[in-house]
Amino acid sequence: MALDLASLLGKKNPPLVGLDISTSDVKIVELSKSGDNTYRLERCASEPLPKGAVVDGNIENIEQVSEAIRKVIKKSGSNVKNVALAMPASSVITKKIILPADLSEQALEVQVESEANQYIPFAMDEVSLDFCVIGPAANSVEDVEVMLAASRKEKIEDRVAVVEASGLQAKIMDIESYAARASISRLIEQQQNAGRDQIYALFQIGSKVTYISILLNGDVVYERDQQFGGNQLTQDIVRNYGLSFEEAEAKKRQGDLPDS
């Protein structure tokens, strides 16, 4: 369920910073909107996480992660307190469903929850459920296509807890892959002919997994994840230069490797 960045950063909404919590570090980004409907990077920073603080997208040590967030906020110089963050795709169940277009908002919510029971292998009181109407259904003018998303409450609460422990407020919870697509969509819109009929590839390279999405005219036509990432490069540096993992990671980030 992609974030509408224009809505998030509009005048009617409070300022937000984007916060990414990964296995290896936390990152923060603050944007501002220009008059020509483009965005400018105001501040950004990253702070490494202790090993084991986040494992497979799950927060294992709230204090270590919240301390890293406090450090990255200070490093960035941002004074914005409202945060947009996201859940790993692996922690979220998503499903597109078709529903009648003439349902009221309340009836739509009831119908979505009823449909969700078929796809979610947990009790409904254990999950947080959200949905958005994508648009008219492809094969019926009387129906709409709806995207529903659900995640275990405990996983969401852990991310909210580290944000609040850092003195911030979580305002938006998205899905990492959808947020990334929303961002690249903004860039595509600035290309010739708004990128129409052009193929774009989005690579999200994490410490252990690389996610690949191929987009055409706003639709994802192919996506896959590969079990390799930045940690493999760091391990190669360790072997080639005889450094510790921490030293190799620092030099990789700084571009401070010897010529030979």
Predicted regions span which residues?
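Hydrophobic/aromatic-enriched cytosolic interaction surfaces used to assemble or bind macromolecules
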Residues: M1-S260
